[in-house]
Amino acid sequence: MAQELRNITISAPGFLGINTQDSPIGLNPAYASVADNCVIDQLGRVGARKGYELLTTNGPAVLGTSDGICCILEFISRANVTTVFSAGNNKIFTGITTLVEVTLPVGYIITENDWKMISFNNNVYFFQVGHAPLISTAGSTTLTELTSSGSNVPPAAAEAIAGFGRLWAADTATNKYTVYWSSLLDGADWHGGSAGSIDLTTVWPNGYDEVVAMSEHNGFLLVFGKKNILVFSGAESPNASLTLEDTIEGTGCIARDSIQSTGTDLIFLSTRGLMSLQRIIQEKSLPLNDISSNIRTDLLASLTQEIQANGHRKAIKGVYSPVDAFYLLAFPESQVVYCFDVRAPLENGSFRVTTWSAVNPRGFSVFADDSLYIGRVNGIVKYDGYLDNEVQYQMRYFSNPTDFDTAANLKFLKKFNLTIIGGQSTQTTLNWGYDYTSSFQKQEFTFGSSSIAEYGLTEYNTDGEYSASIIIQTPKVNSTGNGSVVTVGIEAQINNASFSIQKIDIHALLGRLI
């Protein structure tokens, strides 16, 4: 007796992001096993990330064989003059198109590129462990060294922030347990006025810890150790009223530049994964939430690789883009960027996550116009368009293996109906495989191509449907083979056009019981 042809629909494939932590069988089909060079677009679909445009023209000449630009800061003076500072190859630069070295104090030697650049009170301050702090007055390209009378000289600290009307610094080469603060509105004075410091050795809840990072959040000064977080109130007048309000034990920050504020949350990397410190104004409580639980094993493997290769975590960078509604966490050694969609958490508290490859960022900065700029080996690039420096890049989506809730039957796939948004002139490959194989059957086709005579491509919608200049592509692809579980994948060579996966319809016959 002939079996009835069934239609199986994967609506919004990958909508829930990657999940490599849970068992794939029985997992919601809206999860993906692979979503590389993808974002969750504004309509909740998996789509291609944007590309990048190289802006710097003299990168190789000034950056040599170094890691490239490792940090970027846009400074806007009170006179409304914009200066972009960046650092790499043991140099500090101004400019974007042409990187021009700043003038350093006579005899000043830079040995690392792990600068913390801070805009404060119409000046830019430069802090790095083992280096005397520097200042650019009102955006000047001539930097001077911070000096102070007395014994309390400006700390040569790895971490520094601006908050509560002053600068705060911690983590020097010889002291990782003291937090220093400058005088009010004077980032150059660390000795007189209202400057001061606090020793945290008796404050940590679980014995000795080391300061890694600091942040101002919800009216508190947060001090992040490697294993604990200290919450201080009264930072507006620290010499008189700095008070330990709360401690969060067992979770700290292990990468200074992973800390990013989203306005309502504070995101940071810990030994347990990527964490969110949620803001509740009424109670001023600070609950923790692991937002990387769906990929925790993969993320921690990237972290381990970073430590094994470099012996530290300084190269790990994070950034929050409000206009794109994502948080990026880059691991240079494994050449992967995790892209977390921060619009809303999933039911388990995790954020939807995709990955990026081939970008290889060394630093991030979001400018005043909300544009995302990235430091790379060859200079400064802008996150924009759908080419990587005029070169195509590959977007990859693969489902988790699924039995379509009929575990006892063989599945004979007959035809795929795809609904793709965008994708003009995009070379695309449909993949399908059975029973956990990594060897997929493939069908290639190109949207916008006049040639549709490839095997298995039975119908091709060349006109599509248009809405606000976005084309809707609906190719239909014949398929073969059978198995008990099925994996589906789409690979697309992004070619200067957006590409989002709306829906995958599968026509299948259910066979005998296994």
Q: Where do the protein language model's features map onto the residues?
A:
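Beta-sheet repeat architectures centered on beta-propellers
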Residues: M1-T97, T103, Y108-N122, G250-D265, ...
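A short beta-strand motif characteristic of beta-propeller blades
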Residues: L55-L63, V100-G107, L143-G150, I198-W204, ...
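Short loop/turn positions that demarcate and connect the beta-strands within blades
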Residues: S66, P154, N206-D209, C253
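Surface-exposed loop/turn elements that mediate protein-protein interactions on large endomembrane-trafficking
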Residues: I92-V100, P133-L146, T178-L200, S233-S241, ...
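Short glycine/acidic-enriched loop and turn motifs that connect beta-strands
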Residues: H131, A173-K176, G273-M275, G379
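Asp-box/WD-like beta-propeller blade repeats and closely related beta-sheet repeat scaffolds
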Residues: A138-A162
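Carboxylate/His-rich catalytic cores and anion/metal-binding grooves
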Residues: A162-G187
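Surface-exposed extracellular loop regions of Gram-negative outer-membrane beta-barrel proteins
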Residues: L221-I248
